[in-house]
Amino acid sequence: MSKLTIWLTPIWILAVGVTIGALILLLMWGVTWLVNRRAARSIAEAVGEGILRPISYVVISMAALALLASPSMPVDRIVASLKRLPDVAPIEAKIEIKPRQADFEVPASFRASELQSFTITSDQDVAVNVEAKKGFVEPLILVQGGEPYSWAPGSSTPRKFEGDASTLFITNESDSPANVSILMYTDVETPQVRAIPIAAASTVGLYVLYLLVRFLAPRTSVIAAATAKETIAQPLFTMLVMIGVVALVAFVFIPYNTFGEDVKMLKTSGMTMIKVLAIIMALWTASTSVADEIEGRTALTVLSKPVGRRQFIVGKFLGILWPIVLMFIILGIVFLLTVSFKVVYDARESAKTTPEWTECYLEVVRIIPGLVLAFLESVILAAISVAVSTRLPMLPNLVICGSIYVLGHLAALIVKSAAGEIVFVRFIGKLLSVILPVLDHFEIEGAIAGASSVPMSYLGWALLYSVLYSGAAILLALIFFEDRDLA
C-alpha cells in the first residue's frame, strides 16, 4: 500500500458506510414515490431547502470518495468480511458426555481464520476433532482432565483448527462421564467493517429524524429551518468552520515534543477545539436569533401568526441545533482525516516502520465517541443559552453561559477536594453539582487520547443526561418566555 492509501483507508471505510446509508435513503424515497407521490415531493423539498442540503453535499462528497478510491482499497476483503458479519458470534456449550462415548456431536460453525480465542475444559481426558471416527487415534486436540486447553493470538498453545468447521466431535474413553465446556470467540477477518453498518445507520437516522420533526411538528420545523438557514448564512459560521479546518490541518505539523505521543496531543487539542467552536456558535446564535428578535419585536410579528410561544422556543432551539450538527460533521470528517494522516506522518518523521492502515483506523475510531460526547455537551449549553436569551441580551448571555461552562467542568473537582473540609465549601460544591450541568462527564479527551475505549453504556447514559438536562433547560426557557412582554 502507498502512504496515501494507508491513511485514507479508514476514512474510505466510513465513506462506504455513508454511501450505503444514502442508497438506503434513495430506496426508501423511491418506495415512497410509488406509494405517495405528494409525500415524496415534500421529502425532496425538505432535503433541498433545509439543513439537509449542505449535509447532502457532505454525503455526496463521501460517496465520491468511496467510489474514486475503491481501485486502491482492499475491496475484496471488505466485501468478504461484510458477508460474514451475520455468521460470526461467540460459541458457548456445556455438555456431559457419557462414559466411553465416541464422536459426541457439538454444533459449532466457524472458520479457523476468524477465531479470536477459544477455551475447552473437561474434568476427564477427551479428544476433540472436526471429523468423525478420529477419536484418540488421531486427535486434533487432546484435552487433559482438569487442564483447560486455551488459545489466543500470541500464545504458545497451537490453534490446531484449520479451514471451516461445522461440528465438533468429542470422544470420552474414560469410565466416568465428562463435563465439557467450550467457549469460542470469532470475528470476521477484517473487523473494521463493523463501522460500515454503523455509519450507514447514522446517515439514515439523521435524515429520518429531521423529516420526522418536519412532518410531525410543521410549524416548529418552519421556525427551525428559518433559524438554521439564517445561521449558516452568517459570516460567523463560515469563519468558525474555516478556523477549525485550518487549525486541524496545522495541528498535524506542529511539533509537540512529546517523544512519540504527538497523536495523543492532536486528538486532545482537536476535540477540545471543535467543541469550543460549536459552543461559541450556539451562544452567538441563541443571542441573535432569540434575544435580538425579542428586543427588535420580530418575535411579536412571528407570534401574531398561528405560532405559539412553545413552538417558537422549541423551533429556535432546533434551529440552533442543526447548524451545530453540520459543524460537527464537517470538522469531524476533517479531524478524522488529520488523525489518520498524523499516524503516518509521525512514523515518517521518526524514521519508524510505515504503519499498517489498521493502526490508523484504530486511532480514528477511538475519537468518534469523544466527538459524540462533545456534541452532547454543546447541546446542553445551547439549551441553557436559549433559556438565558429569553430574558437577557447577548453580553450577559455569553458571561453566564461561559461561567456555567467553567463551573460545570470544575463542579466534580470542587466536591472531591472539599470532602472532609470546610462545610460551607462542601455545600457550595454539592449545590453547584446539583444545579449546574456536570460537564466533566463529557470531558474524556484524556482517556480517549490514552487509547482507552468508551463503552456504549457510557454513551447511552451521557445521551440520557444530555436529553434530560436540555429538556429541563428548554422547560425553563418556556417558563421565562411565557409571561415575557413582547410589545
Predicted ranges, named:
Residues 229-242, 395-396:
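Membrane-interface helix starts
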Residues 68-195, 199:
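Beta-strand-enriched, solvent-exposed domains that form extended recognition/catalytic surfaces
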Residues 41-52, 224-229, 290-319, 481:
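Helix-loop-helix units of permease transmembrane domains in multi-pass membrane transporters
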Residues 4-24, 30-34, 197-202, 206-208, ...:
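Secretory targeting signals
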Residues 10-33, 55-63, 67-71, 191-207, ...:
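Alpha-helical transmembrane segments of multi-pass membrane transporters/translocases
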Residues 26-49, 206-232, 482-486:
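Juxtamembrane interface at the cytosolic side of transmembrane helices
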Residues 241-244, 316-317, 324-325, 329, ...:
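Residue-level recognition of transmembrane alpha-helices
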Residues 56-74, 243, 247-257, 360, ...:
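Transmembrane helix segments
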